[in-house]
Structures are given as structure tokens and as C-alpha cells.
Amino acid sequence: HTQTDSINTKILYRIEQTDSNNITNSDAIYNRPFIGVQKTRTAIGGYVEGNTNYFSEDGIIEGFSMELRRFNLFIYSSISRRIKFLSELEFEHGTKEIALETAQIDFTLNTAFNLRGGVILPQIGIFNANHDSPNWEFIDRPLSSTNIIPSTLSEVGFGVYGKLLKDNSIISYNLYISNGIGDGIVLNENARTSIPAGKSLEMFEEDNNGIPMLNGRISYALRSKGEVGISYYGGTYNS
């Protein structure tokens, strides 16, 4: 009891996950290094990614190069017992690119069924929802998560999500509708279908054709052993 009182008197304190055995890949946006602020319902967090590379291509050596690739800030707030807010702001390559990657409100009803809306992360594959650099033991993101699925892909939309907890396993699901990407997915300089080329700033303002895209993912996880899932992302993209 004395130790608990000591922790509560700190202005800033580390927030620990209390149900780590029930965390799946779709929970990664909340399973982050947050610092709580005393007597508030708000927490802040973030990470910095910097690296150095030695470039050599086709016998041509460019030598060493250093880069501050990402500087990300998180803000979390428990507005009420059932309503929580999360945002992520990313500064990439110094300040060359600034993006609001997440700004969502969750209405938590119970473990099996909840509502989510705002700037969300579509559940495509495993990496888009769990893209924070400190979570991975490699410097560059996988090609499948950059050239095929443009992590990080953010969209304006809303939907439902939840988990079914079993003795030794977890079944989780996400189902969203969103503005979706534009016709740049096929009308691009790459002369091929490219989801990254379909991204645009307009997708945060309005749907280019008035027909929402559909995204869904379902996964099965064995506690502390692994997770397998299948996802869908599709709809009408041309205007």
C-alpha cells in the first residue's frame, strides 16, 4: 500500500499494460510507451528513429549517411469510463513530411463489441496496425509493407472491433468502412496496380466517388505463442 501511494504522488509515471496476455496485433496502437500525467486522464508517449547507412550500388560507393527518419508523438486520453481518444503525429525525415497518422475515438462497450471512428489505421496485414519502429528488430520496413501495403496507411472512417477470449486463445476482429484510396491505384507512373500511389490528401476530406471502401480482419491467437489472421481491403476506387 505504501508503494502505491508513492507512485501516485509522482507528476509523471509509466503506464503499464495490465492485461498483456489478452493483447493481439490489433491492440498495438495502445500497447505503447505512455507516460501518465498526475491527476489527469491524459498520457503522452513517442519514439525517435535514427540510423546510419553505408551505401554501395553497382560498384559505386556513396559512403556513410545519417538520417533522423521518424519522430513520433502519441497522445492518449480517457475521456470517460467508456470513451477514449488516441492520436499519433509523425515527423518524417526531419520535417520533410508531417502526418497525422491516427486521431480516433473509441466507444468501449465490452470486450466483444466496440465502436471506433476518426482517422484510423486499416487492418491490412500485420504491419499497418503495428508499425512502430521499436517493436521490430530491423532497420528498414519490409518491402511488402512499403511497396505493396503503404505502411503507414491512414484513412477517415468508422467501424466495430472486438475480441472473444478463450482459455488459451483469442479471436479478434475489426470491420471498418472508410473513404478509401483514389484512382491513382491504377493511374500512376509505375504502370501497375499500386496501393501507395492511390494515397492522397483528398482522401481525408471526402470520398472521391461517394462509395466507401470496406476493410475487415479476423485473427486467431494462441496466448504467448503466435497469431494468424486474414484481412480484406477493397471497394470502388475510381471516380
Where do the language-model regions lie?
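Outer membrane beta-barrel
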Residues: F34-F55, E62-D183, G210-N215, S219-E227
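Surface-exposed beta-loop-beta
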Residues: N179-S239
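N-terminal periplasmic/intermembrane-space "pro-region" immediately following the signal or transit peptide
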Residues: H1-E49
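Extracytoplasmic loops and strand-loop junctions of Gram-negative outer membrane beta-barrel proteins
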Residues: D27-A28, S56-D58, I139-S144, P196-E202, ...
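Short secondary-structure boundary micro-motifs
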Residues: Q17-D19, D58-I61, S87-E90, L201-M203
